[in-house]
Amino acid sequence: MATLFDLPDLVLLEIFSYLPVRDRIRISRVCHRWKRLVDDRWLWRHVDLTLYTMRPKVMWHLLRRYMASRLYSLRMGGYLFSGSQAPQLSPALMRALGQKCPNLKRLCLHVADLSMVPITSLPSTLRTLELHSCEISMIWLQKEQDPTVLPLLECIVLDRVPAFRDEHLQGLTRFRALRSLVLGGTYRVTETGLDASLQELSYLQRLEVLGCTLSADSTLLAISRHLRDVRKIRLTVGGLSAQGLVFLEGMPVLESLCFQGPLITPDMPTPTQIVSSCLTMPKLRVLEVQGLGWEGQEAEKILCKGLPHCIVIVRACPKESMDWWM
């Protein structure tokens, strides 16, 4: 009977890739062959450290021993709600990531206090930066900062970053390579701030505005004014009306449009009105409707029949985050 030890290296590597980092390191002690496999560069391209309370000393060890030039994407957590004595992410650690991991392209930070970590310390190779439930300082993203910071940044996700406000949003305009912006629960951003910032971010190709205090109509108006080259839009339907849909009509290169519930707006456009507006968008190929209770209903049939050239997706809202800090 074949055992785990009889499997070829490629199969074992695939199995090991699903293991948490801690277990990966533990199995390296089983035998010399497994130790060699755990050291394989392929296994350390994408690392998720959010499952653990990762002390800085351990993080430094992982950085020196396993990750280094192999690392392509890193997901890690901080200690934002662990008390003032808890260790925090440091500028030195961020700079070391940049120096020792020249291939790092994606960094996702969760529940981290970045108020003492200047943005200038982040790795300059980043193309994607995600902040989830993080704390930032007032000057973290402001426009007056060094314009050469993160020259390759193409995508930034700001999810439940309570300090993020209009001034930070306007500071994003210095990232000339930026093409994708996701705002989730950034309740301090105003309609005026969004409009002013999008005017200078006219090169964006993807915009998501989810769970903010902005009305969908005002967001669509700002998009129609300034983002004529946008290819993907996703937004919550709060404050969406038929008039708001009119703002999107004729968008020349829009390929994907998503409306996300829950349905709390009294003036929500009918499926027929949505079809009518979508037919004016020559490049539209995907329409997605989430959390409006339309799945399996007449509304879904109207959308599918009215937009035969599109992939129409009608489904329930994605599950709420199960992160303990929420």
Curated annotation (Swiss-Prot):
It comes from Mus musculus. One of its GO terms (biological process) is protein ubiquitination. Residues 1-47 form the F-box domain. Transmembrane segments: none annotated. Interacts with SKP1 and CUL1. Gene3D superfamilies: Ribonuclease Inhibitor (3.80.10.10). This is F-box/LRR-repeat protein 12. Pathway: Protein modification; protein ubiquitination. Keywords: Leucine-rich repeat, Repeat, Ubl conjugation pathway. SMART domains: FBOX (SM00256). GO terms for cellular component: cytoplasm; ubiquitin ligase complex. Substrate-recognition component of the SCF (SKP1-CUL1-F-box protein)-type E3 ubiquitin ligase complex. Mediates the polyubiquitination and proteasomal degradation of CAMK1 leading to disruption of cyclin D1/CDK4 complex assembly which results in G1 cell cycle arrest in lung epithelia. LRR repeats lie at residues 51-78, 86-111, 113-133, 161-185, 186-211, 212-236, 237-261, 266-291.
